[in-house]
Amino acid sequence: MVLRTMLVKPHCLEKMIRVIRNLCPDIMVLTEVEGKHNSPSFVNRFIEVLFYYSAYFDSLDAFMEAADPNRLAMEGTLMASAVRNMIAREGGERIMRHVGLDTWRLFLNRVGFEEVEVSEDALYQAKLIVKSYNHAESVSLEMNGKSLTIGWKGTPLHSVSAWRCF
């Protein structure tokens, strides 16, 4: 599920998370964009989106050829629509809204989930995988509290967090 698309309808998001909460899964893993692209201020949102996607495109340059069909599809479909959504749309028309891990922490704690620490083993395995690629020095894998933040050249791009019912 993509929670960032539900932020525009907070009552639906809360209802869905409460349904998951009532199922009381042993663990729920949340992987989300680590961006603050939900500002009502166009200028603030534009700057955040610019820095985030500059880092994202830079990482694609490092790992994929410019003519790679997968890269072209990702840039032309996924990323273009996300940027267009966050920059060119306002209010209810702006469907995709990225918020940072701290916002998800507050929300999930409020609806009955507690954060579970990503294990040292998982972090170690992630670092081993990253080291197997060129440009590994540009990838950051850092703990943010109990969660993992994945970044490129100092810019956080994604977070991975684990949650359980309390």
Tell me what each language-model feature is:
Residues 1-166:
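Domain-level detector for long C-terminal conserved domains
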